[in-house]
Design a protein with these regions (language model features):
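Terminal substrate-recognition subdomain of acyl/acetyltransferases
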Residues: 2-60, 174-213
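Aromatic (often tryptophan-rich) hydrophobic motifs at membrane interfaces
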Residues: 105-210
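A conserved beta-strand-loop-helix scaffold within acyl/acetyltransferase catalytic domains
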Residues: 20-145, 161
């Protein structure tokens, strides 16, 4: 068509100049977080006191274990979580695409009760070995996991297995920033407990301009 949308990531301006605007409900991240993983030794030393206690509970219990899942099984149980239909559909499609494109770089972990195959919580991560980074893709928790340390157990498993694969950064991806949907707040608080360091970005500016002939 004759029109183009231009995107400008400004590092200094907080407000758009004349002719530019901030898109409502912009999908671009404005805050991300990551944790550094040591080459050897404990991965939990920088965790919050609460996360450390939950890790101890996970290690002390014997009823639950973490297994690696295939994409179909992960998506089957992910579809049972309390997220919106649109979010479930979007992340399910994303997981299936990544499984085809990245194969063994995609890791899908599930918490199950020993002796069963019913997944009560899950975590999807994608390794980027070229930069020694592992990226958080999605996670879920069903009602059966709410009174258990399953989510913290999954993060501990992610950190430890990443360390064994030579990963040095576990990237939690997006965090709540002012103006985002309030539904982000709870999971953002959870992800903030693991020695997380944050990167904040200015809002992106947009401009609609006629395409040059």
């Amino acid at each position: 068509g004759p029109w183009r949308i231009h995107k400008w990531d400004s590092y200094t301006l907080k407000h758009p100049p004349a002719g530019w605007f901030v898109a409502p409900g912009s999908p671009w991240r404005r805050r991300t977080g990551y944790a550094s993983i040591p080459a050897t030794g404990d991965v939990h030393l920088d965790w919050s006191d609460l996360a450390k206690r939950e890790r101890k509970k996970w290690l002390a219990q014997e009823q639950l274990e973490i297994i690696e899942l295939d994409p179909e099984t992960y998506c089957q149980f992910y579809a049972r979580c309390d997220k919106s239909t649109a979010i479930i559909a979007g992340f399910t499609a994303s997981i299936k695409r990544k499984a085809i494109a990245h194969k063994e770089r995609l890791h899908l972990y599930g918490v199950v009760r020993r002796g069963t195959t019913d997944v009560i919580a899950g975590l999807a991560i994608l390794d980027i070995p070229e930069i020694r980074t592992s990226l958080h893709i999605s996670g879920f928790m069903l009602d059966a996991a709410r009174q258990t340390p399953s989510n913290t157990g999954l993060i501990a498993h992610w950190f430890m297995t990443s360390q064994a694969r030579g990963i040095r950064v576990c990237d939690f991806d997006g965090f709540y920033a002012k103006g985002d949907a309030t539904s982000w707040k709870g999971f953002s608080r959870f992800k903030s407990q693991f020695g997380t360091r944050f990167i904040s970005y200015q809002k992106a500016f947009f401009c609609i301009a006629r395409k040059k002939q």
